[in-house]
A protein has these predicted regions:
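Tryptophan-centric aromatic hotspots in well-structured domains and transmembrane helices
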Residues: 1, 57-58, 89-91, 119-121, ...
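N-terminal core-binding DNA-recognition domain of tyrosine site-specific recombinases/integrases
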Residues: 1-10, 15-17, 134-138, 154-160
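Basic, Lys/Arg- and aromatic-enriched nucleic-acid-binding interface segment
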Residues: 1-3, 14, 18-76
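Short, basic/aromatic-rich helical patch in the C-terminal catalytic core of site-specific tyrosine
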Residues: 5, 9, 73, 143, ...
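Conserved tyrosine-mediated DNA breakage-rejoining catalytic core shared by Y-recombinases
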Residues: 25-30, 66, 75-119
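Exposed loop/turn and edge beta-strand positions of beta-sandwich/beta-sheet ligand-binding modules
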Residues: 34, 56, 87, 106, ...
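Active-site/catalytic core of tyrosine-dependent DNA strand-transfer enzymes
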Residues: 96-97, 111-154, 160, 164-165
Length: 168
């Protein structure tokens, strides 16, 4: 838009409406270099699993074994889990009362890993939200806490669990 406005002001100068373009000295800064957060290395995954963080451990397992985003995890409901006979159980990721999705393409069904099935059967709630104590903000802050406690996690964020899953 700066370029178009500057061209308009140049036109105004040419038409005699202005004596000089007041925006002539303005320059657009170059876009900053993007430094995306890294993919977890297997050794870092081991650190996360060994930490068995009381707040994030179950969510970390879901992130690593499904590739779900933190917002999707925080809004996960027991009702989102469906059994498909001998195919096992699946998570149906769709908008619900707790969460919106990043895009329409984010709607999907994800097969549940056996470790997660066991977690559902033994630890997580059987109705309502599976992670009622978690919000995206809490996930971000708790992961930052883990990063401080485990310096080898430097350069990673919770979303790195999704990146790790995608590379497996």
């Amino acid at each position: 838009i700066l370029k178009q406005m500057s061209q308009f002001l140049d036109w105004c100068v040419g038409e005699g409406e202005l004596t000089a373009n007041p925006w002539e000295a303005l320059k657009v800064k170059e876009r900053p270099d993007v430094h995306p957060h890294g993919v977890l290395k297997d050794a870092q995954v081991s650190v996360l699993l060994r930490a068995k963080d009381r707040v994030l451990h179950s969510a970390v397992l879901f992130g690593l074994l499904t590739g779900m985003r933190s917002g999707e995890l925080c809004g996960l409901m027991a009702e989102d889990i469906t059994a498909k006979g001998n195919l096992g159980r699946f998570i149906s990721i769709r908008p619900n009362a707790v969460r919106l999705l990043k895009s329409k393409a984010a709607e999907r069904e994800v097969p549940l890993h056996g470790v997660l099935e066991q977690l559902l059967d033994t630890t997580l709630p059987t109705s309502g939200r599976l992670f009622p104590h978690l919000t995206v903000d809490k996930v971000v802050k708790r992961y930052a806490y883990l990063r401080r406690r485990h310096p080898e996690l430097h350069g990673t964020v919770f979303h790195s669990t999704r990146k790790w899953f995608i590379t497996q």
